[in-house]
Amino acid sequence: MRPTLAVATATAVTLVVSGCAGWGGGPGGGGPNSINVLMVNNPQMVDLQRLTAANFTADTGINVNFTVLPENDVRDKISQEFSSQAGQYDVATLSNFEIPIYAKSKWIAPLDDYVAADPTFDQSDILPPMTTSLSAADGKLYGEPFYGESSFLMYRKDVLANAGIEMPANPTWQQVADIAARVDGAQPGMAGICLRGQPGWGQVFAPLTTVVNTFGGTWFTKDWQAQVDSAEFRNAVQFYVDLVRTHGETGAPQAGFTECLNNLIQGNAAMWYDATSAAGSLEAATSPVRGKIGYVAAPVVETPSSGWLYAWSWSIQQASTKKDDAWKFISWASSKGYEGLVGSQLGWSRVPAGKRASTYTSEAYLKESSAFAQPTLDAILRADPNNPGVQPRPAPGIQFVDIPEFPDLGTQVSQEVSSAIAGQTSVDAALKRGQQLADDVASRYRERSK
């Protein structure tokens, strides 16, 4: 998906971690007591590397050979590795987008038996929407979350207060638009709201598809009829484009997660609708807006909630010959104990949160994250990937449609929408092209169902 979950460096690294950590090239061949893990280079994973040798390896005797790559590169490599069932890697980081697709293709192993035999892992503590989104159509569990997120509305409490505005706990999109108009220019260079406009299925269409859902739209009907040019889809996109063009940030057609984060931190936006994971940066000790941000539920129109759901998670390759050791690693990395380890050694603000109910009852964690912990938990618990809108869907997913074709489809249509945000085309023209692209995908599914 893309930079909703924070990305670290842009440089690929390969790290071999064993009883005594060191740098190496490629996955170590290891031995009977080693596993190979392929993962994205996000900060939470970098922390995991630092802690593995002295803790997991010291306790289990299992050496872990990490191959760590930027997001786009790791997705490509995982796809190549798992589709061929090469068996070179035992564990990989996958999201709740890939896991149901990979499970259907039998590229990853079900985890139910491991969970049942490992009561200390405490699957019941994993937030239910995470378990649901990491399960496949066969009802089996194929991934365990490392950290997760939903989406909510972030706003400058002081700016709204100075304007005499009280933010509703569950705002509608029209209320948000009205507030954006009132606080636009409240301070020099401050936009009323920041919304992603950057092309990409995981950029502009992450927030925008949630807007489509709550406006009553959908990409496809249950029987695979494309709906990109429907009145509901069009109304949602027109609303979004008009809002960001009228009261949004400068450079909106190029603005993604990082750009909007920087805008809010630097005082260039009064509101921002995006990932719950952004709150940690906004409330960091060095943030100039620490303590000034309020957090409320994702705005709605026709649905009771509209926040998305995303999780970086662990899965085991079906071809792995070391599944037992692979599970031991997953069980440790996604455990309550690991969160405590990160909190005590690296700081509670760096805990890979958003997956366990117990995180949100930890006094130490809440001391660091009291401003956003409850709104984050509420957003995740309200997310329903199987029922994100007002009509039945042919595939699960809130901010995406969980089919292999969606990244390409979403990215192509997003380019048209970004052009509309830039004023280079109309929403009608953008969605006319989008409907053609969506119908090409839908027609293939209709053919398969005959």
Where are these regions (language model features)?
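Hinge/lid segment of periplasmic solute-binding proteins
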Residues: N96-S150, V204-P207, G294-V296, I380
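Extracytoplasmic/periplasmic solute-binding protein
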Residues: A136-F146, S151, Q174-A226, Q238, ...
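Glycine-centered hinge/linker elements that transmit conformational signals in sensory
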Residues: I179-R182, K222-Q254, G294, A298
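Short, solvent-exposed loop/beta-turn-alpha elements that line the ligand-binding surface or hinge
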Residues: D112-I126, A169, I193, G197-G200, ...
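C-terminal lobe and pocket-closing loops
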Residues: A116, A278-V289, E302-T411, S449
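Extracytoplasmic "Venus flytrap"/periplasmic binding protein-like
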Residues: N55-I126, A161-G164, N263, G267-M271, ...
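Conserved C-terminal helix/tail region of periplasmic/extracytoplasmic solute-binding proteins
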Residues: A161, D384-K450
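Short, low-complexity disordered leader/linker segments with a strong preference
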Residues: M1-N36, A116, D428-K432, Q436-K450
